[in-house]
A protein has these predicted regions:
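Extracytoplasmic catalytic/substrate-binding loops of multi-pass membrane glycan-assembly enzymes
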Residues: 5-17, 29-45, 52-59, 109, ...
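Short acidic/glycine- and proline-prone juxtamembrane loop motifs at membrane-interface regions
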Residues: 11, 34-35, 101-114, 311
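Loop-to-helix entry region of an early transmembrane alpha helix in multi-pass inner-membrane enzymes
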Residues: 32, 36, 40, 50-71, ...
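Transmembrane-helix motifs of polytopic, lipid-linked glycan transferases
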Residues: 60-83, 117, 121
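Hydrophobic, aromatic-rich transmembrane alpha-helices
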Residues: 76, 244-287, 299
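Short helix- or helix-capping micro-motifs
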Residues: 92-100, 124, 141-145
């Protein structure tokens, strides 16, 4: 009942839908400021639709988005089983399913639902040190890079999670190395296409302008093709201002955003969950450590982006991992 099927998509979801229509007609041109993974996924469904009414494509994108978001509820149950028994895994799924910000986003036809789903799947497989699971995890990390431009950050986060969690395990470097090869194979078609289009396999319209003082200046720099590198910022404002604005400022912005996303109920549970996770005895310490590494490294690596673009959507992918910590106090109160 939250979905209005009477109006077409607009803004970012309009661009994704138009790109998906183009893909279904054989045009795989990559836009300079967003990934094409979601639009390619949508195009597989659009290829079965023959309509002159754009509203039909808009509504199909919404339906697919809702379906993907719904499937994440089942996947987080599987991830939660690494931490809890069946009862509390079900609680984890329920808490995740009723997060209002994610529910609202899921009806928009945007890329966040499939982004979250793919990251969750990658994290699920990386919790196992067997070669086949590490390989699957890094293949999924490659798909994440297709979906969003910040997918490379997720690859680094997944890599850190694996390397720091399983550093004492036998063959962990061999498994990771083989997984990276598959990651590169998955990523290479996108990189080659970008190289053909822009002469740079890692091209983005934000490239060279990310270290702007604020979002307005970032857009102005992109429009005027003005470069603003980290070196330029340090030269003009000093190293202290650089760390204060992009690292500390981004970190504070991230915490503020996560607090807003934790309303209406996670903000009560999460502080206790964080505290109890430091002395977890009902969960494997290895998995708790992996969850901590994923959350902290994600916040730190996203700090520069969040300092300039404090957009809530950029941190939606962290919510499943915060929900896991939020279930720990429920388990403690119930069991002890």
């Amino acid at each position: 009942y939250l979905v209005d099927f009477s109006i077409p998509v607009h803004s970012d979801n309009l661009a994704y839908t138009l790109n998906a229509i183009a893909h279904s007609n054989g045009d795989f041109t990559q836009p300079p400021h967003r990934g094409i993974g979601w639009s390619i996924f949508l195009s597989t469904f659009f290829s079965f639709v023959d309509s002159d009414n754009f509203l039909d494509y808009s509504n199909l994108s919404r339906i697919v988005s809702i379906s993907v978001a719904t499937s994440s509820i089942f996947l987080i149950y599987g991830v939660a089983r690494k931490f809890f028994d069946e009862r509390y895994s079900l609680v984890t799924s329920c808490l995740f399913a009723f997060l209002p910000h994610l529910n609202h986003n899921s009806i928009m036809g945007l890329s966040e639902p499939i982004f979250i789903l793919t990251i969750l799947a990658s994290f699920y497989f990386i919790l196992n040190n067997k070669l086949k699971f590490v390989t699957i995890s890094l293949i999924l990390a490659g798909l994440v890079c297709w979906i969003r431009l910040n997918g490379l950050i997720i690859f680094i986060v997944i890599s850190l999670t694996y390397l720091l969690t399983f550093k004492k395990s036998q063959n962990f470097l061999r498994n990771y190395g083989i997984g990276v090869i598959f990651f590169i194979l998955v990523l290479s078609p996108m990189l080659l296409q970008k190289y053909e289009q822009y002469g740079d396999p890692f091209y983005s319209s934000y490239q060279g302008s990310m270290f702007s003082e604020n979002y307005e200046q970032l857009i102005s720099n992109i429009d005027s093709n003005t470069k603003s590198s980290a070196f330029d910022y340090i030269q003009n404002h000093g190293i202290a201002a650089f760390f204060g604005n992009f690292l500390l400022g981004g970190f504070v912005n991230s915490l503020n955003i996560l607090f807003q996303l934790s309303i209406p109920y996670l903000f009560i549970l999460l502080p206790f969950g964080v505290l109890f996770s430091l002395r977890a005895f009902d969960q494997k310490s290895q998995y708790i450590k992996a969850n901590w590494i994923f959350i902290i490294s994600s916040i730190l690596l996203m700090s520069v982006i969040i300092s300039v673009i404090p957009e809530k959507r950029f941190l939606f992918f962290l919510m499943p991992f915060l929900v896991i910590f939020s279930v720990i106090p429920i388990q403690r109160v119930t069991e002890y």
